[in-house]
């Protein structure tokens, strides 16, 4: 998509650049702030957080934010073992209501929701020959834990 296309809002739908920033915001909140007490982009939630006013942030900026956040969160998520999934983060002295495993599910489902939204936006923009699957389905096969 072009920079201009990334800012297009159709009715109440978010724009693609917002979606990218919004996903970075959830990962930053879950895996950096709650998981490690780190905050790379302190103003991100006010720009693209749930329930905040609609915004159309620049695509390049949101991609930079997303890459910086996901690089940090990937390092953290590599340390999450099955036993941790049933535990809860403690933030500011309070145990979070959802387990880490539930938060991981929520993060995955959230990506799928907004991936679908971005796909619909691209269709509305007139893009053709869009992918039918995310990733290489031949190589993405289930492998049981050892």
Task: Locate each region found by the language model.
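Acidic/histidine-rich alpha-helical segments that form the ligand environment
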Residues: 51-91, 98-113
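Short, contiguous alpha-helical
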Residues: 3-49, 91-146
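Short, flexible helix-adjacent loops and helix caps
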Residues: 2-6, 82-85
């Amino acid at each position: 998509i072009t920079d201009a296309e990334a800012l297009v809002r159709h009715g109440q739908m978010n724009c693609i650049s917002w979606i990218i920033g919004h996903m970075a915001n959830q990962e930053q909140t879950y895996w950096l702030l709650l998981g490690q007490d780190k905050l790379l982009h302190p103003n991100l939630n006010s720009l693209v957080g749930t329930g905040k006013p609609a915004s159309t942030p620049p695509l390049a900026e949101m991609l930079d934010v997303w890459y910086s956040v996901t690089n940090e969160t990937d390092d953290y998520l590599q340390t999450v073992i099955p036993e941790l999934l049933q535990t809860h983060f403690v933030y500011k002295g309070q145990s979070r209501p959802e387990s880490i495993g539930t938060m991981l599910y929520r993060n995955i489902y959230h990506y799928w929701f907004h991936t679908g939204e971005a796909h619909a936006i691209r269709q509305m923009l007139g893009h053709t020959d869009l992918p039918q699957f995310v990733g290489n389905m031949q190589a993405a096969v289930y492998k049981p834990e050892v």
